[in-house]
Amino acid sequence: MFLGTYQPNLIGKGRVALPKKIRNEIRGERIVLTVGFEKCILGFSEKGWEETISPELSQPLFSDSKARDLRRKMCAEAEVVNLDSQGRFVIPEKMLAYAGIKDELTIIGAGDHFEIWETKNWENYRAKAFS
């Protein structure tokens, strides 16, 4: 389970090291990233991604426009990303732009996935959502 809040440094353009506690939950050399709903990036282990997206893929394709929209958003923007031996990876440029990440980022554990936020956006969201 992905837990905790971390503020790793960006290493160069979009390169970041996953915190060890997050990395320990991945159990592999690849992760799946996609855009989130609150201008953040969602991260999954490959198995976690399959478990998350499978129910969405079983929704009625022709009769449910909201299910189609969610499927498109989740899948069209998703990318499989390789981790190096230290758990470092490059966040795709389009995802950095979507989330507004330039200098500082925050990674939060969210149970079955983790999220990558621009730090100020996370702090603002947290202040509103948790007050």
Q: Where in the sequence are the language-model features?
A:
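Flexible "stalk/tail and boundary" regions
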Residues: M1-P8, G12-R15, I22-V81, S85, ...
